[in-house]
């Protein structure tokens, strides 16, 4: 996941939540983004990278700060049958307006039913509101 901060301060207090197979309440409710990415206490203020988790880009806690973090669940899978929804709050109590970007990988066994048609690409692309300092 990558983050571009649109305001000063720490972006990483948003809780991670995993909703399995249509749950109304999450089966997994974490304690903060930095904990989910296994880098508590602001990732130690410096980049790090391991096989299953890391923070290769650690920016300043300022408007325009850029961060990139990752975690692979090879050693801690989250099983589901029909659906898995993963969310991360944008700051504690969803009180931040930063830009978050993410990607998820899933390994499909064969055979499988046909997948639904994806919306047009212009409908799937995020609307980006760049931070003022990031443009300087």
Predicted stretch roles:
Residues 1-136:
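Beta-strand-centric surfaces of beta-sandwich/beta-rich domains
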């Amino acid at each position: 996941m990558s983050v571009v901060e649109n305001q000063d301060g720490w972006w990483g207090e948003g809780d991670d939540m995993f909703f399995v197979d249509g749950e109304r309440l999450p089966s997994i409710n974490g304690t903060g983004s930095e904990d989910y990415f296994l880098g508590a206490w602001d990732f130690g203020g410096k980049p790090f990278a391991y096989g299953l988790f890391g923070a290769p880009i650690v920016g300043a806690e300022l408007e325009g700060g850029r961060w990139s973090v990752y975690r692979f669940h090879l050693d801690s899978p989250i099983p589901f049958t029909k659906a898995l929804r993963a969310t991360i709050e944008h700051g504690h109590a969803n009180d931040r307006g930063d830009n978050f970007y993410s990607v998820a990988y899933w390994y499909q066994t064969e055979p499988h039913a046909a997948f639904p048609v994806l919306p047009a690409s212009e409908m799937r692309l995020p609307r980006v509101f760049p931070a003022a300092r990031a443009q300087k």
